[in-house]
Each structure stands twice: as structure tokens, then as C-alpha cells.
């Protein structure tokens, strides 16, 4: 069984990105466990392990989406107030479901195929970038060689001039 690489490296995430991912994960876990009610994060290891074992795979569908900047979904109301938690979570879930069905209809592919297609497109884009950088590198090498020859010629001319001045 081969390990699949992550879409990002651990060193590339800033602290605010990690915090946003953590908050998103807590929201998903709390909405799945309590069917939309807001709870505080689990306090002990037993509760944490229970929350991970009771997850519905559909609640983790956000993991298959393309990584990008985290969306800000905070409102001015307190996050655990009954009015805001139930209505905003329901609205967010509805919007996410509509967005996913639109994406699937537009692409005409399953999420796994769309993910593979994105990976293939990214790989092709990376190959194009490598080719462009190789061309630029070669051009810069030629420019360095030209400038080196020019500096050597100028240096020789300067030395000749200084020698001729001392002889005269």
C-alpha cells in the first residue's frame, strides 16, 4: 500500500492557516456529533477518540476539495448562540451541498476523477514552469558568459592603456 502525498507540505502552512483548519475541523466534528448544535472542543482523550470514530465519511468531503485560503464564516453574533449556530450551520451546509452538485454537474466527473484531473493539470503546469525556468536559466548563463568576455576585454584594454601611459 503506497502512501499518497499531501497537497501541501507541513512547512508551508502558517500558524493562522493551521488555526483555520483546526477550527474548521472542530466545526465539522461538532455539527456531526450534535446535529448542528454548538459545543466546546472535546476536553479529554476519550471524548476525542469517540468523536473521530463516529464521523460520517460525507462530513469529511471538504478534504477532497482543492486547498486554498480558508473562508471566513464568522458573524457578529456569538458562535454558540442558538440562533446563529443552527441557522448559519444549516445555511453553510446547504450552500456547500449546492456548490458540490454544481461542480459535479459542470465537470461531469466524480470527485476522485476531478481530483486526478486537477493533479494532472497541476503536473503539466509545473512541467511548463520547469521548461520556462530552464530556458531562462540558459539565457542567463549566456548573458553571464557575454558579460564575462566583455569585462575581460575591458580589463585588458585598461591594462594596456596603463602600460602605455607609463611607457610614454
Curated annotation (Swiss-Prot):
Extent of Basic and acidic residues compositional bias: 118-141
Residue span of region N-terminal: 10-26
Region (Disordered): 31-141
Entry's transmembrane regions: none
Region (Interaction with TRIB3): 10-18
Compositional bias ranges of the Low complexity kind: 76-90
GO cellular component: CHOP-ATF3 complex; CHOP-ATF4 complex; CHOP-C/EBP complex; cytoplasm; nucleus
Phosphoserine: residues bearing it: 14-15, 30-31, 78, 81
Record region (Leucine-zipper): 133-147
InterPro entries: bZIP, DNA_damage_induc_transcript_3
Subcellular location: Cytoplasm; Nucleus
UniProt key word Cell cycle: yes
Protein family: Belongs to the bZIP family.
Name of the protein described by the UniProt record: DNA damage-inducible transcript 3 protein
Protein's organism: Bos taurus
Lineage: Eukaryota, Metazoa, Chordata, Craniata, Vertebrata
Gene of this entry: DDIT3
